From Swiss-Prot:
Taxonomic lineage: Viruses, Duplodnaviria, Heunggongvirae, Uroviricota, Caudoviricetes
Gene3D superfamilies in alphabetical order: 3.10.450.40
Pfam families noted in UniProt: GPW_gp25
Known role: Baseplate protein that is located next to the tail tube (inner baseplate). Involved in sheath assembly. The gp25-(gp6)2-gp7 module is involved in sheath contraction.
Protein name: Baseplate wedge protein gp25
UniProt family annotation: Belongs to the GpW/Gp25 family.
Matches recorded under InterPro entries: IraD/Gp25-like
Gene behind the chain: 25
Assembly notes: Homodimer. Interacts with gp53 and with the (gp6)2-gp7 heterotrimeric molecule; The gp25-(gp6)2-gp7 module is involved in sheath contraction. Part of the baseplate macromolecular complex which consists of gp5, gp5.4, gp27 (central spike complex); gp6, gp25, gp53 (inner baseplate); gp7, gp8 (intermediate baseplate); gp9, gp10, gp11, gp12 (peripheral); gp48 and gp54 (proximal region of the tail tube).
Induction text: Expressed in the late phase of the viral replicative cycle.
Annotated localization: Virion
GO CC term, one of those recorded: virus tail, baseplate
Keywords carried by this UniProt record: Late protein, Viral baseplate protein, Viral tail protein, Virion
Domain of life from the UniProt record: Viruses
C-alpha cells in the first residue's frame, strides 16, 4: 500500500502563493477531492480543448424537482467522474432531492485505487442561483 499523501498532487484550486512564491499544491486525498469538485462544478462545454469535461448540472437545477431530475444528475456525475478521475475506485453517487428548497444533496462515496478498502465521502448541496 502506497502513501497517497506523496503519490498524488495537483495545483491547489485556490491558487494561493506558496512560501517559495510558487503556486501551492494540494496533496494526496485532498487533491483527489478537489479534482472531484472541479469535475462536478465545471459546466460541460466550458473548456475549449476538452468540451466533454464536466457535468451538465445547471440545466437540471432549473427543472422542476422530480425523482427523474435527481436520477439524471446522479448519472451525469457518475459518468463524468468515471471518465475524468482515474484515481477513483468503487464509486457510488447518491442524489437526494429536497423538494421544499429546490436543492439536491449529492453524496459521493469512493475509494482511492491504491487503497480500495478505505471509503471516502464528499457531500455537497446543489441549488439553482435564482430561487424565488
Amino acid at each position: 500500500m502506497a502513501n497517497i499523501n506523496k503519490l498524488y498532487s495537483d495545483i491547489d484550486p485556490e491558487m494561493k502563493m506558496d512560501w517559495n512564491k510558487d503556486v501551492s499544491r494540494s496533496l494526496g486525498l485532498r487533491s483527489i477531492k478537489n479534482s472531484l469538485l472541479g469535475i462536478i462544478t465545471t459546466r460541460k462545454g466550458s473548456r475549449p480543448f476538452d468540451p466533454e469535461f464536466g457535468c451538465d448540472l445547471s440545466d437540471q437545477l432549473f427543472e422542476n424537482m422530480t425523482p427523474l431530475t435527481a436520477d439524471t444528475v446522479e448519472r451525469n456525475i457518475e459518468s463524468a467522474v468515471r471518465n475524468y478521475e482515474p484515481r477513483i475506485d468503487k464509486l457510488a453517487v447518491n442524489v437526494i432531492p429536497v423538494y421544499d428548497d429546490y436543492t439536491l444533496i449529492v453524496e459521493i462515496r469512493f475509494s482511492v485505487i491504491d487503497n480500495p478498502d478505505d471509503i471516502e465521502q464528499i457531500k455537497l448541496q446543489l441549488a439553482s442561483s435564482n430561487r424565488v
